[in-house]
């Protein structure tokens, strides 16, 4: 029997340290697609990518999504990547992938080759949004406000003369404490807050385990604010939210443990600051050619009234504690409608 429902390929998992977070996000999206009015419009097809990079069929993928024990006895029917263009039942791709190979432009290029629309930014916006060094270079060219930073590559760590110049830059430009981050990871994975040269050296070595490119940023004592972006030809910004946490900084544990962090939505800000953040969020996305959906993170120093753009996340999380869907719900857009809007925007 002919069906006019659109088939949505929900792709999740992946070769990334954020694999488990991706599964949680995908479960939220998958359930939203099967909710009330969306159920009449869409058919959700989960597609799991395991930690080795193999793609799996719908049955196996659904068993992973809902942690069904019987997935252990399923025959692993892997999908041949050469046949992706022939997956005629997929109308729109919905990536729920985080980190390398998922939100860095790699899979976006693959989706583009199938000729089917996909949710989120294209190859360029995804790549720039993933690499913090490249992203900050673009922000600098657009004169967007950001904290002082320096960057280095993993091979440079062994060069004593080069590292001596880095230490001098830390003292002159950055100062302690500072953050050392892998350039291409999210969810605070691989990050260290260093209060001394010794901690800085340890942080560099730690970050180098995750990435060849490393960024060092000045630590700003201020409020951490976030704003959601939705749209392509016309971008809209959500209300501004604030993240508070019990840890020294917004660690992986505090991001995904409700007992260690809390959110205030909307944030308690005067209207001028709130409007400025919403405007800067759109400007940041346009600068790196990000569209569809994004979450833009900020630092705000009340004493100076200074706003700093931290980063643009082009595939923000969709877990129960994730800010992006929560920000939009507070803006009047419920999860089910948000997911439907993202699919329709992808087809523009």
UniProtKB/Swiss-Prot annotation:
GO MF terms, alphabetically ordered: ATP binding; D-alanine-D-alanine ligase activity; metal ion binding
Reactions that this protein is recorded to catalyse: 2 D-alanine + ATP = D-alanyl-D-alanine + ADP + phosphate + H(+)
Keyword flag Lyase: no
EC number assigned by the record: 6.3.2.4
Cofactor, how bound (note): Binds 2 magnesium or manganese ions per subunit.
GO biological process terms, semicolon-separated: cell wall organization; peptidoglycan biosynthetic process; regulation of cell shape
Pathways per UniProt: Cell wall biogenesis; peptidoglycan biosynthesis
Superkingdom assignment: Bacteria
Protein residues bound to ATP: 171-226
Subcellular location: Cytoplasm
Single GO cellular component term: cytosol
Binding site for Mg(2+) 1: 297, 311
InterPro entries noted in UniProt: ATP-grasp, ATP_grasp_subdomain_1, D-Ala_lig_Van_CS, D_ala_D_ala, Dala_Dala_lig_C, Dala_Dala_lig_N, PreATP-grasp_dom_sf
Keyword Magnesium included in the entry's annotation: yes
ATP-grasp domain location: 136-344
Pfam families (alphabetical): Dala_Dala_lig_C, Dala_Dala_lig_N
Entry cofactors: Mg(2+); Mn(2+)
Binding site for Mg(2+) 2: 311, 313
Main location: cytoplasm
The entry's keywords: ATP-binding, Cell shape, Cell wall biogenesis/degradation, Cytoplasm, Ligase, Magnesium, Manganese, Metal-binding, Nucleotide-binding, Peptidoglycan synthesis
HAMAP family the UniProt entry points to: Dala_Dala_lig (MF_00047)
Assigned protein family: Belongs to the D-alanine--D-alanine ligase family.
Function: Cell wall formation.
Name of the protein this chain belongs to: D-alanine--D-alanine ligase
Organism name: Prochlorococcus marinus (strain NATL2A)
Lineage of the species this protein comes from: Bacteria, Bacillati, Cyanobacteriota, Cyanophyceae, Synechococcales
Gene this protein is translated from: ddl
């Amino acid at each position: 029997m002919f069906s006019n429902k659109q088939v949505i390929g929900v792709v999740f998992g992946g070769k990334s340290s954020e694999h488990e977070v991706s599964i949680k996000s995908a479960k939220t999206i998958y359930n939203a697609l099967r909710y009330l009015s969306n159920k009449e419009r869409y058919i959700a097809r989960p597609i799991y990518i395991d930690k080795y990079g193999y793609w799996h069929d719908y049955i196996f993928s659904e068993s992973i999504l809902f942690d069904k024990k019987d997935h252990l006895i399923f025959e692993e029917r892997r999908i041949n990547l050469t046949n992706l263009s022939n997956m005629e039942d997929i109308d729109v791709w919905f990536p729920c992938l985080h980190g390398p190979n998922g939100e860095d432009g790699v899979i976006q290029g693959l989706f583009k080759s199938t000729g089917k629309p996909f949710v989120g930014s294209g190859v360029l916006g995804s790549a720039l949004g993933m690499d913090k060094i490249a992203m900050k270079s673009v922000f600098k060219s657009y004169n967007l406000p950001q904290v002082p930073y320096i960057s280095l590559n993993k091979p440079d760590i062994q060069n004593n003369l080069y590292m001596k110049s880095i230490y001098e830059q830390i003292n002159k430009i950055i100062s302690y404490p500072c953050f050392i981050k892998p350039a291409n990871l999210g969810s605070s994975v691989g990050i260290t807050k260093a209060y001394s040269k010794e901690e800085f050296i340890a942080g560099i070595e730690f970050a180098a385990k995750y990435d060849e490119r490393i960024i060092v940023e000045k630590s700003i004592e201020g409020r951490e604010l976030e704003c959601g972006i939705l749209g392509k030809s016309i971008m809209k910004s959500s209300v501004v939210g604030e993240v508070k946490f019990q840890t020294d900084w917004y660690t992986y544990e505090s991001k995904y443990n409700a007992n260690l962090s809390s959110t205030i939505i909307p944030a308690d800000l005067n209207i001028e600051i709130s409007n400025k953040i919403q405007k800067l969020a759109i400007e940041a996305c346009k600068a790196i050619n990000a569209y569809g959906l994004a979450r833009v993170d900020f630092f705000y120093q009340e004493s100076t009234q200074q706003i700093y753009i931290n980063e643009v996340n082009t595939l923000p999380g969709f877990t129960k504690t994730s800010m992006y869907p929560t920000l939009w719900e507070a803006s009047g857009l419920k999860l089910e409608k948000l997911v439907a809007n993202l699919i329709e925007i992808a087809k523009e």
